[in-house]
Amino acid sequence: MPTFASMDEKGAPDMNPEQWANAVYDPLNKAVDEGRLVIANKAPITGLGEGWWITPGTIEKIPEIKGMTAVEILEHPEWFPFKEDPSKGAFHGCPAGWGCQLANANLFKAFEMEKKGWVLIDPGSAAGLDGSISKAAESGNPWFGYYWNPTSIVGKYDLQPVPWGIDFCR
């Protein structure tokens, strides 16, 4: 966000090669509409993004999960026991202060995940989120949560994206 804020307020730097536009969606569109910024290439890389993922160990331990959508997985918090209260499911969210934190918190609320028996885990930092994935993947335990790609974690642990199962853009 600091690079975007500097560009928007000071006009420098001239170029931002990697901006997650969804993290600054409204102010970016306003800056473009007002002529302060220009989007030179709207989609330089395809097939990338962010979303909800599971580890291959999840599929090995819960074979029926293969091909399921997020909406279907949300009916099974028992597959991802929360350490502090195993009667609830653990969903690993986005680190505090990141743009994706609000999006994931809103999805958690919109999908009524708490009512379904889920707990939204704040990993505290990118390292905390990576650590939760590494620990689950290396031990073969189920893991369900937010992540993005391309990243070394997605490649190293062969994380599997979970389709939403609903159409967000009608």
Residue map of PLM features:
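Structured segments of extracytoplasmic/periplasmic soluble domains
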Residues: 4-10, 27, 31, 76-80, ...
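Pocket-flanking alpha-helical
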Residues: 1-34, 131-135, 152-158
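A conserved helix-loop-strand patch within extracytoplasmic ligand-binding domains
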Residues: 24-93
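Ligand-binding pocket segment of bilobal, Venus flytrap-like solute-binding proteins
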Residues: 18, 92-169
